[in-house]
């Protein structure tokens, strides 16, 4: 008789495997990114380092907020989440990756000057650039591997692609736009948010109306993507809870009545996979 093989905790039943969502919404300051993030369904924790959380509060968001003033605060938030047996949130929002990158650079240069007082805190050397690029990539990967849905926000930048055409991307510096492209590759949805005045027919007449437009599939010069292929190309005045529900419906092949019920099912799977997640997280810590 064959001896039963004891499987490592990293191997689980397919029915217990939960694929969490990783989204990125980018746009100009004041376009409403944080307001939309604050309207995510379920229990939301915003890791906030920009003032957009005030606007989210005014719109009635019930999200919790963890103030991120320095890179070390972000590391502390990650460490806390990674070491929980069960994360008590449905979504973690990092607002924004653009500002987090600035805080990462400041953290690196503070340490550089402590070790070498003759160095200028405002002039990174080549090795310092490599360090913050790798630290940013590690940070994004680590948060995205947590057993929870994650939404990032970012400001926008314009770069020139290899054909000489403009491309609008999340503002993440490094190697022209290679680091920004790498971050986008880690996401299931990359969407661009902008405030626009468009012509629409209202009561039989064409009028100019203000809309908040979310571009969710590539529309040159804007880079965007929807891995689920269910969100369309553009969404005016988006309701992010409805967009999340579309994705959940596409996963099951039928409407899901309540996100909360799905969260409860995920909680059971999370308990069974906590050991595996913690092992992976410990190997790939945010470097602080």
Model-identified regions with their sequence ranges:
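Intrinsically disordered, polybasic Lys/Arg-rich low-complexity tracts
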Residues: 33, 257-287
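Conserved GTP-binding G-domain of TRAFAC-class P-loop NTPases and closely related GTPase folds
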Residues: 158-270
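Structured loop/turn residues at beta-strand edges in well-structured enzyme cores
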Residues: 87, 146, 185
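P-loop NTPase motor core
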Residues: 97-182
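Short, well-ordered beta-strand core segments
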Residues: 44-46, 150, 190-192
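Conserved P-loop
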Residues: 4-103
């Amino acid at each position: 008789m064959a001896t039963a093989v004891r499987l490592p905790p990293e191997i689980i039943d397919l029915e217990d495997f939960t694929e969490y969502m990783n989204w990125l919404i980018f746009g100009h300051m004041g376009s409403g990114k944080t307001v939309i993030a604050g309207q995510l369904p379920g229990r939301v924790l915003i890791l906030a380092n920009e003032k957009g959380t005030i606007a989210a509060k005014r719109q009635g968001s019930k999200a919790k907020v963890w103030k991120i003033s320095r890179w070390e605060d972000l590391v502390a938030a990650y460490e806390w989440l990674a070491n929980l047996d069960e994360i008590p949130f449905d979504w973690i929002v990092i607002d924004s990756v653009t500002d987090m990158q600035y805080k990462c650079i400041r953290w690196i240069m503070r340490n550089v000057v402590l070790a070498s007082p003759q160095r200028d805190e405002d002039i990174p050397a080549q090795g310092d650039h490599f360090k913050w690029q790798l630290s940013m990539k590690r940070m994004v990967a680590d948060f995205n591997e947590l057993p929870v849905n994650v939404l990032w926000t970012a400001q926008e930048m314009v770069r020139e692609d290899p054909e000489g055409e403009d491309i609008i991307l999340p503002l993440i510096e490094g190697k022209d736009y290679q680091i920004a492209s790498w971050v986008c590759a880690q996401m299931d949805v990359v969407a661009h948010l902008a405030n626009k005045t468009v012509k629409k027919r209202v009561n039989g007449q064409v009028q100019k109306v203000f809309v908040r437009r979310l571009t969710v599939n590539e529309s040159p010069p804007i880079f965007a993507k929807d891995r689920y292929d269910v969100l369309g190309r553009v969404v005016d005045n988006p309701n992010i809870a409805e967009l999340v529900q579309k994705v959940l419906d596409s996963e099951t092949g039928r409407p899901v009545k309540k996100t909360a019920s799905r969260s409860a099912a995920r909680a059971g799977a999370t308990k069974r996979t906590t050991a595996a997640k913690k092992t992976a997280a410990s190997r790939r810590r945010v470097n602080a």
